[in-house]
């Protein structure tokens, strides 16, 4: 069996910087493009920094055509600052992190009320808002506690396109139905695992991420929604590489590295459930329609032949362990013929 995808997009990707960027950028290029997260150190907070980071990504891709949908880290922006960013062809939107909620988010928003002036400007200019929607409460309840904020944002800014990133709960799916200006991304890991897979037996640090994996009923609901072809649900890997020594330690970093295997694993999942025809919209069609995107043309063919995942990816002094490390997947990408 084969599945052919046109210009798949990853609507939530971490590429990091420096040597880590040089390692993971080509490994993320099975997709035709991606929304790139801005939580570097220091974060990407202006047009010049955004353009410079985009150019570093382009260099790291080594000539692979790749649509870079770049984001700014949310802060108070003036109209002039937003216009400068909007003038860049690679600018996509602004990512809001509650302060301290995830990797390199210490400079995130501490007072949601203070966001209103910038959000009004974004609404007027048609700039999408992307949100890591978690509170600082009990870890299993953080997304649920943030949902009322999503609701208020959707009501107060009805023309603002708001993306609830990496949703993990049935409750978030219910909220998605309430407001047409809400959309959402879902990760591979949250379609596959629950908290029990992370900590139910031996601790599995390479499955630990934020938002944390939830209960089986949540995973099943997310999968049903993805398989159904929901028009405002998109794939966003949240592929988040960390050096192996920062994952296999006390106080390990949060993040699952899935970029090199995401498309074959999704193909297997959708085919297994008789929904191969829904995969195109999940990994590209919905995003292109919602955001009027035109990624570089790329045709990817996947086939139900085995693919071995390495124990780690290493180069430039970096070593990153992926999800499914050392395992054999049932689907793989068909190599493109040279010439």
Residue ranges and their predicted role:
Residues 9-11, 23-49, 63-75, 91-104, ...:
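Divalent metal-dependent hydrolysis catalytic cores, especially in the metallo-beta-lactamase
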Residues 228-295:
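His/Asp/Glu-enriched, well-ordered alpha-helical/loop segment
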Residues 68, 142-159, 177-188, 241-260, ...:
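Short, electropositive alpha-helical surface patch
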Residues 18-25, 77-88:
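Short, acidic/polar
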Residues 80-96, 104-235:
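Histidine/acidic residue-rich metal-binding segments in metalloenzymes
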Residues 15-17, 40-42, 74-76, 98-100, ...:
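Active-site-proximal loop/turn and secondary-structure-junction residues that shape catalytic pockets
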Residues 1, 267-339:
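Active-site microenvironment of metallo-dependent hydrolases
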């Amino acid at each position: 069996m084969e599945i052919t995808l046109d210009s798949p997009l990853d609507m939530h990707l971490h590429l990091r910087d420096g040597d880590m960027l040089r390692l993971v950028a080509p490994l993320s290029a099975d997709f035709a493009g991606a929304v790139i997260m801005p939580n570097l150190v220091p974060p990407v907070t202006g047009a010049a920094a955004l353009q410079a980071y985009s150019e570093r990504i382009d260099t790291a891709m080594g000539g692979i055509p790749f649509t870079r949908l770049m984001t700014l880290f949310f802060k108070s922006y003036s109209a002039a600052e937003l216009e400068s960013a909007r003038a860049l062809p690679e600018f996509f939107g602004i990512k809001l992190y509650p302060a301290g909620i995830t990797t390199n988010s210490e400079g995130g928003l501490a007072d949601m009320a203070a966001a209103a002036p910038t959000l009004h400007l974004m609404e007027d200019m048609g700039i999408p808002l992307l949100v890591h929607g978690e509170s600082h409460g009990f870890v299993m309840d953080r997304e649920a506690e943030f949902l009322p904020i999503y609701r208020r944002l959707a009501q107060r800014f009805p023309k603002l396109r708001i993306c609830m990133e990496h949703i993990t709960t049935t409750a978030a799916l219910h909220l998605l139905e309430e407001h047409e200006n809400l959309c959402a991304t879902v990760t591979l890991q949250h379609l596959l695992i629950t908290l029990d897979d992370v900590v139910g037996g031996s601790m599995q640090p390479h499955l630990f991420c934020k938002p944390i994996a939830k209960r089986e009923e949540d995973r099943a609901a997310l999968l049903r929604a993805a398989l159904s072809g929901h028009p405002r649900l998109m794939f966003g890997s949240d592929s988040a590489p960390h050096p192996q020594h920062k994952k296999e330690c006390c106080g390990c970093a949060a993040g699952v590295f899935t970029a090199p295997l995401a498309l074959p694993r999704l193909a297997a999942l959708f085919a297994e459930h008789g929904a191969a025809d829904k995969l195109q919209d999940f990994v590209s069609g919905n995003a292109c329609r919602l955001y009027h995107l035109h990624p570089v043309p790329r045709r990817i063919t996947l086939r139900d032949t085995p693919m071995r995942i390495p124990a780690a990816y290493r180069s430039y002094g970096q070593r990153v362990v992926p999800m499914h490390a050392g395992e054999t997947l049932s689907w793989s990408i068909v190599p493109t013929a040279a010439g």
